[in-house]
Amino acid sequence: MQFVPIKDAPGYLVNEAGDVFSTFTNKVLSRYIVDGYPAVKLQINGKQTSVLIHRIISHVFGDLYNLFDPELEVDHKDRDRLNLSKDNLQVLSKIEHQRKTNKDNGWSDSRVPCPLCGSLMLQRSVTCTNCKPKPTGRLIKPELSLDDITEKVLLMGWVKAAKELEVSESTLRRRYTKLTGLSPKVLTEQRKSK
């Protein structure tokens, strides 16, 4: 079988059987299984990335335009995760794929798209977990200012300053980061340089 370049993975080629060839090592890459799906490790932009082989086949020989598109999923028509035939693969949105999976497994389709982002959520929910407002929590000692923190830490260090201001050291460091956008290490370095 003829190897064809993988558009979104320069230096790699694939054939219709799902063998992935590296031009860096001049070898066919070893496969391993991730959640029942055959996968390979590719070096993309200097980082090692696990890529499912059925996504590569669908990208090169099918309808998956972008190999790493998180909005599209590749479905095995016959539900056999090891069947990598390009005729057995189809590209679906997350919602379409969930509905097909529910139908294939005989489950009721109790999930609906979130009105804000479109990802699947339970029918009785108002929004999905991603769009649900996160609790803000209670701010400990809201009157604690950046000047108070800076003055005390430069004078006595984080531990003693926290004790003096009656908060934990981690609370003091988090408050400093929240107020300045800087790491607490910046203030520690300033103290050392005095």
Swiss-Prot record:
Pfam families: HNH_3. Its EC number is 3.1.21.-. Induction: Expressed in the early phase of the viral replicative cycle. InterPro entries: His-Me_finger_sf, HNH_nuc. The keyword Phosphoprotein does not apply. One of its GO terms (molecular function) is DNA binding. It is an enzyme of class 3 (hydrolase). Keywords: DNA-binding, Early protein, Endonuclease, Hydrolase, Nuclease. Gene3D superfamilies: 3.90.75.20. Endonuclease that cleaves only one strand of asymmetric DNA substrates thereby introducing interruptions into the template or coding strand. This is H-N-H endonuclease F-TflI. It comes from Escherichia phage T5. The gene is hegC.
